[in-house]
Structure formats: C-alpha cells, structure tokens
Amino acid sequence: MQIPDCKDNSVFIRPNFWYDIQNTEKKYAHIIMIATKPDIIKQAPLYLELKNRWELVVLVHTGQHYDYNLSKWVLAEFGMDVDVNLNIYWDIHKKYSLIVERLWDFLVSIYNDYKKIPVPYVHWDTMTATTADKAAFLNKFAVVHVEAWIRTFTPSKKFYYNLFEKYEKGKFDWEKYYKDLQDFDIYERWSIEPYPEQFDTRAIEWSTWFFAAPVKLYEKTLIFEGFPKEHIKVVWNTVADAIEISKQKMWNSTAFEKFPNMKWKPFIFITIHRRENTQKKERFLVIYNAIKKLIEDWVYVCFLGLYASEFAIDNYGLRKDIEKLKEKYKKNFAYGPALAHHAEVIDMISKAWAVVTDSGSMQEEANIVWVPCVTFRFGSDRTETILAWTNIVAPPINSRLMAEIVKWAISNKKMINKNHLYWENVSKKIVDEVLRMLKKNWKLFKFDDERLELWRFFDWKI
C-alpha cells in the first residue's frame, strides 16, 4: 500500500477515486476522518465495518501526521487505504483553516457534482474533528461524533491543597488518596486541559447529529447539557475493537527486540506528549525528575521518546542527562522511539506492571488489558477509569510524590479489573445506529421546522 506524500502542498485524491464515486449507486458517502495515530487506531474498526457492509466509504487523512511511525505503518497494519490526503501544513492556526477550506471544497464537490450525501465521522477531541465538523456543518451536513463528550474531570483546588500540605508534612496516605479519588463530588469540569483538545470536543457538539458515547457517564452529562436523548447512544469505545484486531497480530511483534532489557521484567511503560506537560518547563522538569527517581530507585522503566517529549528533552537541556541514565542504568532503563505498530504497543503494555502516561487513549488501553494506570495530569478525560479503580492521577507538581504514587500502583491488584469498561463489537453498534437514523431521516442535518416535524403546519397564505 502506498501513502502518497504531496511535496507541492496540494490535495491528493487517489487515482480513479472520482470514477468510483460516479459509478456507485450508493446514496451516502461515509467519510472517515483521520489524522493522528490514535485517530487511525480508533477509526479503523469503523472503516472496516462499513467496508464489510459494502457501504461507500471515503477515508480522508488531513496529512499532518505522515511521519512513518505516526501514520503509515498503522494504516497498513489495519488495511486502510487513504482516498484523500488534505496535506495540511504550517503552524496550528494555518492547519485549522486549511482543513476547513480543503475539506469544504471536497464536500461541495462530492455533493453537488456527484450527488452523494456526505456523512462525516469525526473522532474524539482532535483538531481534525473540530475543523472537519465546521466544514460539514457550514454546508448543512451534520456529523457522527465518535467518542462524544470527552470532558476532563479535575479534583478541586481544596482537594489538591490538602494533598500537597499533607505530603510536605510527611502524612501522605496512598490508600486514602486512591479512595478519595472515587468521590465524584471532588471533581470540577472546567479544565482546559488537555489543551487545546478540551476546546475542540466542546466545539464539535453543536455540529453533531449522532453522539456515540463511550460510557454511560458521558450520556448523562450530554443530557444534562441539553442535548436530545434520542440523538445519544452509549455504544462504548471503538478502541476495544481495535485492540481485539491487534491482539491477533501480537505474535509478530518485535517490541521486546527493541527493548530487550524489559523482557520478562516487572517494568513500567511510560509515554508523555501533552502540550501542557512538554511545553511548560516547570511541569516537564517535575515529570522528568519523577521518572529519573524511579530509574535511580531501580524500578524497571521503559520510556518512549515521542516527538513532544523529545522536543522537551532537547529544549530544556536534558539530552546529556538522559544519555547518562541510559549508560548507568542499562539493566533497568530503556529509552527509545515510538513503536510504529499498534500490536507492538498492546504487546508491551499488556506485559507491563503499570502504564504511566498523559495520553487519553492509553488510559483506556490499560483498562482493557488489565494493567494499572497512572496518569501524569491534574485530572483525567477518562474519569470512568478512575471511578472504576483502574487509574490514578499523579499531579505534575512534586516529583517525589509522583514517583511514590507510581510505586504504589505497580502491579497493585486493587487496580486490576478484569471486567473492562469498553465492551466489544462497538463499531457494529455505531454503524447500526447511523444507518437506522439515515433510513428514518434520510440526512443528518435538520433545521428546527424539520427536526420538530412541523411541515404540515406551514401556511404562507395571507
């Protein structure tokens, strides 16, 4: 499979694409939007489900993550062929505008010139989702929001003041902290972290016709915010389907060849990439030194150098230090690049004794493979995993406290729940519901007179 790189910054449309569109009798074009690696992994089961039903599926990649490790291998891994590469570039504000502009033109063409009704599937809380939905909505096409209403729940200022004051006095009680995080009343919902994703997910909701909620908690909060119940369905999370696919390929994983000193060891698997953690020096130094303390205390640590954490290590002058750690702690420390294949990631985290991350999707994956998770944030946009006792936040303020929280979590049996939260056959549930809605409504965009079915009362006579 070839994934074209468009060096002239133009939009790429695969050969014969428009011919194929013109020669199909299908009425709806199911447009799967992807960009980041988690996007691809979680949208892959939907793409495959629609393909298996012989629906007209169009895979649109924004093009911003065409680094081989971030995109190409995982596309090939799931058998996904890109139809349209929007090939966006430049800084983040330019990327926002380019997605809207280029997808807009594509949607107008597929609708006006080829008479296909676009049904865009946007995922999660990404820049791709919050721009693709605008291109659709402004052309009177509503979207299917996969993993809808992802909100961060953060313990209050009072809760954290109490935590840090007690820790400074030597009175930290891990068991009490772990239990206190189960109290739903301690949480606030106004965090802008992860940034800018918490803006993105909120900005998508008004363009959405079908909310594919990953857990019941989000169904309740969507209804609380005023969205109609009949447009919301708890379908669980497509990551569960993706993991089932990847488990079948783990036999071919070479992950432990890349990190041989972790094989058969009680290691922790670490990834850090969030902007607020890597672009804010104080926070990254706290996180880095928490990891360093774990290494120096002879905990087995596998730390993946993602693009953002690599940037931070260089930007804050830590490159020599991490190289010294690699040399001094060869037995218990591994540091290397991101794993290209999802099956390799699942192979490693399923054998880890804990996952330490600031990633939302990895919190879910840890829950599914029955491994304790420690989230290096102040709150979580996967609060359901905390309330299910399988995840604990380690706020990036005090390195020693963070390291202590991680040590308590390693292979903690209380944090292993073999009834994971995200079920199975999720993509089937989503496609079933979308096709049912299309059959009933024929399109996923309606003004109020249509939505309220008031057409029989129209009367423009004087």
Language model features with spans:
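Nucleotide-activated sugar donor-binding and catalytic core shared by glycosyltransferases
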Residues: 1-304, 308-462
